[in-house]
């Protein structure tokens, strides 16, 4: 008997194997629902950031509590994304997605009804827990709904439309805060969640069932659930507490100890939260490292560029937000091209191209900061925006395509964990480089050293962080100190951008040595 191998092209496979239940048109509606869920998460991130000053004034909360409105949410995302992905594999991705979506909508409602800073932080933590259940399930459902030849295109839609929502976030947040109430920044998630959840129930996405018995790794859950938050909080707060402080070292050390124990446990249990065998696949390992490095390089860019524009170049907050569009818009519009490129040639060439664009763009951004030229900075931001889709989209699509459909929730959770942890570590390292450079400037420049006592004041500290009210007050009270501060901030952030460019150069080498020149096909279980 002759056995014929399947030698169809990706395009033929797409037509032959998509949703064998005969639900071809519905996969695009499923994609729309999954895209809506991610758009909700990404819009929430930028809208809330704009509303923080108004929230602080309305609820009467101090700066420490205000910062935890953002930090608490990010800690949960970085700490529990892998667990959320595993839950989808164990109990069903559509079920996990539905629970996550309803829970995210409910917690958003409670955030909008918060009566104090502490209650808002608590509901933001709850919001984060439901996000880590919803997001890995949604991306796995997208991959499972499309055949290998169309996954890049589908993931481009899944990631591209939410990117436009994120781009519009500052404008939407500003309008809501000015003409309505900051509470609607959270409440706008509720109708989106209801619509997305309803579509999920009606469309019933397919989900391959596991043949083996499901077991829950309670020991691994406990170790991961304590180790990751300890480590992430220590890294995030190191600039505030001091890198050598007992609190930073103690909490960080405890986190690393717990995570080491987690790795040992995962090698031994029958059904781990994270199957460490995934990392024996060279390309999956490359995809994971790629997301870590990319986020480490880029997370601080938008934050520090906005500070540079306001403190050094005297941009208003509104103008500084608009000035970031050269980086955001190209990313939103090029992601479809990146998706089709992955479908045709795999990850290697798109990632190398994206790495070159990002590294060059960050270098130009640093040069533009040194020369205080927005034109050069804008070109640099544009190159970064062009490069990002060619790196992140192939890494996500390729990584999930290399595992069986029953394990894609776990794969998605692992990839997003690398991405989130990269954000935290990159921001901490680049922030430390900037702080060290600024400290050296304060101690070595005679003109600045003359104002060293003022540099330690609350007003100057808040101005250096981009606080618009503090900036205006400092410029009116002491223009000389404001000019000195601008020089310190400029030199520090320029050094930080060169550090980010150095990080991003690793993307090119990962593309050359760890990725493949063809898209991944579905593996056997």
Each predicted region: which residue ranges?
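Small-residue-rich alpha-helical segments with characteristic i,i+4
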Residues: 159, 165-168, 377-459
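Hydrophobic transmembrane architecture of multi-pass small-molecule transporters
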Residues: 16, 420-513
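Flexible interhelical linker loops that connect adjacent transmembrane helices
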Residues: 19-23, 197-225, 267-282, 343, ...
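Interfacial helix-cap and linker-helix signal at transmembrane-aqueous boundaries
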Residues: 55-56, 87-88, 172-180, 235, ...
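Helix-loop-helix hairpins in multi-pass membrane proteins, especially solute transporters
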Residues: 81-220, 246
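Transmembrane core module of solute transporters
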Residues: 25-77, 161-162, 181, 219-221, ...
